[in-house]
């Protein structure tokens, strides 16, 4: 089990594309491994500019994008949508970059 000490933001509804689920299964990895990193502010393999943008997004409620490499080298993204007018994030999506 992977525990998150203090989430930086709410994920909303968690969804995934079939391709991302297949890639995770083939790599024998759980989506929770990456969701827990995402919600804790470990943005994975993003550039410094995207890392800084994500840090700001936690504060201002805009969209958050993380990228992670699976054991087999496949890259997955996790995108958490921007907050609505009530401060709620609707969903977080796990996907392959080519599914964007």
Regions found by a protein language model. Give the residues of each.
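Compact soluble domain cores
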Residues: 2-65
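Short, compact, well-ordered microdomains
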Residues: 59, 64-100
């Amino acid at each position: 089990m992977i525990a998150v000490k203090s989430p930086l933001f709410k994920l909303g509804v968690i969804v995934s594309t079939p391709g991302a689920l297949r890639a995770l299964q083939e790599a024998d990895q759980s989506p929770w491994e990456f969701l827990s990193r995402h919600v804790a502010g470990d943005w994975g393999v993003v550039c410094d500019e995207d890392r800084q943008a994500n840090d700001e997004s936690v504060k201002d409620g805009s969209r958050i994008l993380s990228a992670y490499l699976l054991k087999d080298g496949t890259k997955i993204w996790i995108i958490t949508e921007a907050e609505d007018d009530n401060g709620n994030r609707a969903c977080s999506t796990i996907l392959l970059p080519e599914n964007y």
